[in-house]
């Protein structure tokens, strides 16, 4: 086995870490990077499924896409979750409940808006009873487009959220 050919496949960041470890016997990093890495790798999400997008959201957790392999596990309580996925049409009557559930989540908390209805009202945009985007009620971190968005689109949105968490300071939001 030729070791030089294998080293060409290793990203530069890992080469630097391996070099530091072989020289010193330990690796130094900032606490902020460690916290962000662990947060991004262990997202606990809860569903706020309001319409047909929730079916696609459930499909993402099934064996074909297996969201848990990316470190995202479902939780039944807002007090145990740090990501809320709002999927579907948000009505004026449901908006206070959404805000109440969001307020029960511990910090840091993130929101993914899934589908055209959650993003901006969608097909029902001009209805008197529909909120024109859940970002009017709670701050949204990631928007997943589509009507309904595919399971792959939601998976991509979660991966983008993990990337956003890794790149952001843990003590500022």
Swiss-Prot record:
Q: What is its EC number?
A: 7.1.1.-
PROSITE patterns registered for this protein in UniProt? COMPLEX1_20K
Residues that, per the record, bind [4Fe-4S] cluster: 52-53, 117, 147
Task: List the keywords (alphabetical).
Answer: 4Fe-4S, Cell inner membrane, Cell membrane, Iron, Iron-sulfur, Membrane, Metal-binding, NAD, Quinone, Translocase, Transport, Ubiquinone
Q: Which domain of life is it from?
A: Bacteria
Q: Which reaction does it catalyse?
A: a quinone + NADH + 5 H(+)(in) = a quinol + NAD(+) + 4 H(+)(out)
Record's PANTHER family?
A: NADH DEHYDROGENASE, NADH DEHYDROGENASE [UBIQUINONE] IRON-SULFUR PROTEIN 7, MITOCHONDRIAL
Identification of the protein by name? NADH-quinone oxidoreductase subunit B
């Amino acid at each position: 086995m030729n070791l030089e050919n294998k080293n060409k496949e290793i990203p530069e960041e890992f080469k630097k870490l391996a070099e530091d470890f072989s020289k010193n016997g330990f690796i130094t990093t900032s606490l902020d990077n460690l916290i962000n890495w662990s947060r991004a790798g262990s997202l606990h999400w809860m569903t706020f499924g309001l319409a047909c997008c929730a079916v696609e959201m459930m499909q993402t957790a099934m064996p074909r896409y297996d969201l848990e392999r990316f470190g995202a596990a479902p939780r039944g309580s807002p007090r145990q979750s740090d990501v809320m996925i709002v999927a579907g049409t948000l009505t004026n009557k449901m908006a206070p409940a959404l805000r109440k559930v969001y307020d029960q989540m511990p910090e840091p908390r993130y929101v993914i808006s899934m589908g055209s209805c959650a993003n901006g009202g969608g097909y029902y945009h001009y209805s008197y009873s529909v909120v024109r985007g859940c970002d009017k009620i709670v701050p949204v971190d990631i928007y997943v487009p589509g009507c309904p968005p595919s399971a792959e689109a939601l998976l991509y949105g979660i991966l983008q959220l993990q990337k956003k968490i890794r790149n952001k300071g843990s003590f500022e939001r």
